Amino acid sequence: MLWQKLVTDVEGSPAKAPKVTSDTGLSAPTMATDGKKVFAIFGTGDIIAFDMNGNRVWARNLGVPDNHYGHSSSLICWDDKVIVLYDTNNGGKIMAVNVNDGKTMWQHKRNNRISWSSPVLAEIDDKMVILTTTDPLIAAHDLKTGEELWQVECLMGEVGASAAYGSGLVFGANEYARLVAIKPGAEPEIVWENDEYLPEVATPVESDGLLFIGTSYGVFACYNALTGEKFWEYEANQGFYASPIIADGKVYAIDMDGLMHIFALDKELKVIGVPKLGEKAVATPAFADGRIYIRGNNNLYCIGQK
């Protein structure tokens, strides 16, 4: 380990930590980096930046989120911005803060219900946009200004899965609601919808016209991304909280027991293997430079060829 730091002495941070569930905790969001600094946000509302040597660059408090499970929306970085999605029981906001000093670059109020999903970047019609999901809508915001470009009311309930983009469509889903495919634009429209297999937490992923969904009750499904037709389904013994990842022509989905289910990127069900991590896992793996990084409940793993 190169370094570790405690986040303390943040102006405005609550003296007492807010009440959250044990499943979520105070540090559920995944950290983000611009390659020069790393950024983290916590259930206290503290957001902080460190350089690669562990030196604190800046920190601020965004206000304690009114969130009965705990804040879990991860940060994303693009250019000079850190994007923060901050939906709470008292409404929400989406904002961009500067990577160098943490100052607000833009901020927009969101008149919606609470969510636990993360913002997603997508290039649509030659413009970088931020996609968000919440109850009751999927929305797109201009990355440069934060302006809302469009929204579609199509979700409900406690939204944890983020949006996905591929094949010219925006996908959103939530358990006890529905899976939708939206054609984005000034007048967005729902192209198709399906309510058979829906995620509670895991975000869908699309590639080559195939859309993959992992459910909290153990079903993993593949759909035609253009029509919504189901190609296949697969039943695991445990549910999926981690989002599926596509890499090297394969689909990787780790279940809550720590079994990594590896599928061929194909409209026919082809299970390549089911290796065992050895402990429970609910975080989405990261893939880089031929290696897989997995955060288990107790350990951090790096897996690759020697």
Task: Go through each PLM region and give its residues.
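Noncatalytic, solvent-exposed loop/strand surfaces
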Residues: M1-K306
